[in-house]
């Protein structure tokens, strides 16, 4: 504190009685961005409304849930999709169970929010305005206690206590800006399967991915309740939200398992991310309340005009109130308008919002791959006792061929490999096993938020594809399932589920075609007899009940041209690393 006091003394000429324009502008931008982040965060959370402190996500082990549904521990009786909540567009962004677009909005706005936060913090220290919220003496604590007692007595400290904030406000603002925000930033990356797989040590700092997710949620909840106090507090939670966000990407988590271990595991990071969101919600409520309860005339004059109330005229104060009302109306209009604009044309929104995130993805997460196997992140002791599923095996209406093969224990099943190849080939399960096998213990990451660890046995995709020779123009691999996609976004009849695999994933050692799970033949409910595993990505790329592999020229020529069934119907992104 002595060093800070010396710095404060040296910066004594800084005017703290007025609020410079840059401070007011960055605060307003932050206010708008936080609204977007909270509402899109609710959309993501509603997809799996449960929070855990462990990676296994076993029903009953959650520490917080927003559903009354009871989940059977018999795999397949209750799916993760059954657990999804449908929120109104007035509540979440965009609403109506559109998690794909919710994730897109969350990613895009996070980047804008970070840039605005960087500008704010840089100017805060560059201009000496940091003294507004950084304590420089230990006396801050007894002074804050005195302020708290005044508030608890339902009284308001006199205006002399505010320079420009009283001790309690200053302490709270410091906590939000320099403690909670970094915690939110720190837990955010852990939501990425790529990040968590690449930096498992980082995840362990937060115990595990689900703990990080829970912390992230609590940060959001705190903000929602606290918003009324002061927008400045946002930047304590912000860094933590940012840090845990990438861990939600399977690619990031798999590429940096050490980073994931900083948060203990991926679910711990997810919880931390939630805690940050909760913190923001609490902060917003508290901030707004104090602005209009504790000396509102002074607060409004400072926020809108940057001037002291005693130095302005009645007309100027009226102008400040008008500006405040307009600002709030504009913010609410943007929040609600974004939902209805998104829902008015789902495909357009998917292309625009996900497309806007691509430059940042190309510089960051898309450069990473999971290294869970190479780093031996998990052992057999880590295998989950329960694994969620979000689809059910093919029905007779979807594939009579599959039902016939299943009746004879898949003895006549042959995997087809064709498309743009010189000669198509097919393989039985035994023939695939004869080509070679690998055993990987990895964490499955669903874009809904749940995780599970299992031991997978199969053949590396790149080794299998050596059995055929692609022709010129073969750039992507398409995996097609016996099963159908669960729904289509525009109500069309469902079609066989497919996903297109990027060449960079095909060469990944953690990309395998699995026929075994936990030392047993792959159970039907988890995709037997064959399923794709691509642990740098979210689960929707890992096709179950694989019927055929084929080389294609361009994924834009298949289906709706988005790269797979979940991209076509669920409006997800082709590269599922984040």
Labelled PLM ranges:
Residues 2-11, 295-408, 415, 467-578:
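Extended, aromatic/histidine-rich regions of cofactor-dependent oxidoreductases associated
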Residues 428, 457-460, 490, 502:
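Helix N-cap / beta->alpha transition motif
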Residues 110, 166, 170, 174-177, ...:
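Short, well-structured alpha-helical interface segments that form or flank functional binding sites
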Residues 419, 458-466:
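Alpha-helical support elements that line or immediately flank enzyme active sites
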């Amino acid at each position: 504190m002595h060093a800070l006091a010396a710095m404060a003394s040296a910066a004594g000429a800084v005017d703290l009685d007025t609020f410079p324009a840059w401070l007011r502008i960055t605060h307003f931008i932050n206010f708008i961005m936080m609204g977007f982040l909270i509402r899109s965060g609710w959309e993501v959370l509603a997809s799996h409304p449960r929070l855990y402190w462990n990676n296994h996500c076993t029903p009953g082990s959650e520490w917080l849930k927003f559903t009354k549904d009871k989940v059977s521990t018999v795999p397949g009786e209750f799916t993760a999709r059954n657990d999804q909540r449908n929120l109104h567009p007035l509540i979440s962004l965009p609403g109506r169970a559109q998690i794909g677009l919710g994730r897109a909005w969350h990613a895009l706005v996070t980047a804008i929010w970070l840039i605005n936060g960087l500008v704010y913090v840089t100017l805060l220290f560059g201009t000496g305005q940091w003294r507004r919220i950084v304590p420089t003496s230990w006396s801050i604590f007894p002074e804050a206690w005195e302020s708290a007692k005044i508030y608890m007595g339902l009284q308001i400290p006199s205006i002399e206590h505010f320079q420009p904030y009283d001790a309690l406000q200053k302490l709270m603002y410091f906590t939000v800006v320099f403690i909670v925000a970094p915690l939110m930033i720190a837990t955010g990356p852990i939501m990425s399967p790529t990040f968590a797989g690449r930096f498992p040590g980082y995840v362990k700092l937060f115990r595990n991915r689900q703990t990080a997710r829970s912390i992230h949620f609590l940060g959001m909840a705190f903000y929602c309740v606290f918003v009324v106090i002061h927008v400045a507090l946002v930047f304590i939670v912000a860094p933590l939200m940012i840090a845990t966000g990438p861990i939600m990407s399977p690619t990031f988590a798999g590429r940096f398992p050490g980073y994931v271990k900083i948060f203990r595991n991926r679910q711990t990071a997810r919880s931390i991310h939630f805690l940050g969101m909760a913190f923001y919600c609490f902060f917003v409520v508290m901030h707004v309340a104090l602005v209009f309860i504790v000396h509102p005339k002074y607060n409004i004059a400072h926020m809108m005009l940057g001037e002291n109330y005693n130095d302005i005229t009645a007309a100027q104060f009226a102008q400040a109130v008008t500006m405040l009302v307009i600002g709030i109306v504009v913010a609410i209009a943007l929040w609600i308008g974004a939902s209805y604009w998104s829902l008015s044309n789902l495909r357009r929104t998917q292309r625009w919002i996900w497309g806007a995130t691509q430059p940042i993805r190309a510089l960051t997460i898309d450069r990473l791959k999971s290294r869970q196997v190479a780093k031996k992140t998990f052992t057999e002791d880590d295998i989950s006792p329960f694994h969620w599923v979000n689809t059910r095996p093919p029905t007779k209406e979807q594939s009579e061929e599959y039902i016939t093969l299943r009746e004879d224990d898949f003895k006549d099943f042959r995997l087809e490999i064709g498309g743009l190849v010189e000669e198509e080939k097919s393989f039985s399960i035994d023939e695939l096993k004869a080509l070679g096998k690998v055993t990987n213990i990895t964490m499955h990451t669903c874009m809904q938020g749940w995780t599970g660890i299992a031991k997978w046995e199969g053949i590396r995709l790149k080794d299998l594809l050596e059995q055929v020779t692609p022709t010129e123009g073969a750039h992507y691999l398409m995996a097609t399932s016996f099963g159908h996609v669960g729904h289509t976004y525009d109500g069309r009849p469902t079609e066989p589920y497919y996903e297109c695999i990027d060449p960079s994933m095909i060469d990944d050692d953690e990309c395998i075609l699995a026929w075994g799970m936990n030392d047993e033949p792959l159970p039907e409910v988890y995709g037997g007899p064959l399923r794709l595993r691509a642990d740098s990505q979210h689960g929707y790329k890992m096709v179950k009940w694989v019927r055929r592999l084929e080389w294609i020229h361009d994924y834009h020529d298949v289906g709706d041209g988005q790269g797979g069934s979940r991209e076509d119907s669920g409006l997800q992104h082709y590269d599922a690393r984040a």
